[in-house]
């Protein structure tokens, strides 16, 4: 039994680390552009900039569905310069360094 668990756990860890394929760009360190780089639509549930979920100006909850190649744009004007973007989707969570 423990042998099966050891074989399954690495697969789960690898699968959860993959997350959705999203491309990110920043403009003037305030505007974040997220593009769905997958072949299937995905839904963006939450975006957190600079690992600051407690600051409302650094969080967006758009519930936006993006088809393949489609882009979602959000301005984080009152947040500090964008250094990292955490994106939570219906397919998992991914952290992106847009710089």
Which functions belong to the PLM regions below?
Residues 32-39:
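Asparagine-centered strand-capping/turn motif at beta-strand->loop junctions
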């Amino acid at each position: 039994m423990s042998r099966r668990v050891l074989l399954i756990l690495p697969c789960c860890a690898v699968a959860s680390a993959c997350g959705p394929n999203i491309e990110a760009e920043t403009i003037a360190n305030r505007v974040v552009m997220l593009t769905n780089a997958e072949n299937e639509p995905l839904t963006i549930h939450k975006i957190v900039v600079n690992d600051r979920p407690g600051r409302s100006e650094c969080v967006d909850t758009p519930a936006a569905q993006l088809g393949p190649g489609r882009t979602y744009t959000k301005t984080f004007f009152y947040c500090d310069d964008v250094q990292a973007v955490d994106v939570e989707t219906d397919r998992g969570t991914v952290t992106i360094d847009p710089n």
